[in-house]
């Protein structure tokens, strides 16, 4: 369970350009049908990244703990830590922006988990643990076989004549 509760909703009605700055809400009930509302107070702090006091998603301490889980003897350089934190923040911002566009597309003023889930599944081939995809059916691009390409070329050739 994350700090935003099982299912985060963000009110999109007052924002033309969405800059994510999550505010925590207490977890609620079961993960299946509950929702939590997350307000977006403003834009990120200096340098484009959220500051630790603004509930930054990935902090240096969390990153160091993650590295220690992988290899207890490994130590990251300061520049590498900053770059990884920036990449994580950019990823979160791009996912939230795309999810907000999906919410607006379905004419909703709230960002729901299914918006984030759809973007992550389709664009990044990622799934959110703990959330079933009853509403979102798997989307797979049909791979075109060589025989299909030859048939299509023959059809195009005959229609040009």
UniProtKB/Swiss-Prot annotation:
Residues that bear Phosphothreonine = 43, 59
Q: Any keyword Nucleus? A: yes
BP GO terms, sorted = RNA polymerase II preinitiation complex assembly
Q: Which GO terms describe its cellular component?
A: SAGA complex; transcription factor TFIID complex
Renumbered to this chain, the Polar residues biased-composition regions fall at: 26-36
Q: Which residue ranges are recorded for the region named Disordered?
A: 15-55
Residues in Histone-fold domain copies:
56-128
Coiled-coil stretches are none
Phosphoserine modifications at? 51
Report the main location listed first in the record.
nucleus
* Keyword annotations of the record: Isopeptide bond, Nucleus, Phosphoprotein, Transcription, Transcription regulation, Ubl conjugation
The protein in question is named: Transcription initiation factor TFIID subunit 12
Q: Which organism is it from?
A: Bos taurus (Bovine)
Gene this chain is encoded by: TAF12
């Amino acid at each position: 369970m994350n700090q935003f509760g099982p299912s985060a909703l963000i009110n999109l009605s007052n924002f033309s350009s969405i800059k994510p700055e999550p505010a925590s809400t207490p977890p609620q009930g079961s993960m299946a049908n509950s929702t939590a509302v997350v307000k977006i107070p403003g834009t990120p702090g200096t340098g484009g990244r959220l500051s630790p006091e603004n509930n930054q998603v990935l902090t240096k301490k969390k990153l160091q703990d993650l590295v220690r889980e992988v290899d207890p003897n490994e130590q990251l350089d300061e520049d590498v830590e900053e770059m990884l934190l920036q990449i994580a923040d950019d990823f979160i911002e791009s996912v939230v922006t795309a999810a907000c566009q999906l919410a607006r597309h379905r004419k909703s003023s709230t960002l729901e988990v299914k918006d984030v889930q759809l973007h992550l599944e389709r664009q990044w081939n990622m799934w959110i643990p703990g959330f079933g995809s009853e509403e979102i059916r798997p989307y797979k691009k049909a791979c075109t076989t060589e025989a299909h390409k030859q048939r299509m070329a023959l059809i195009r050739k005959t229609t040009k004549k």
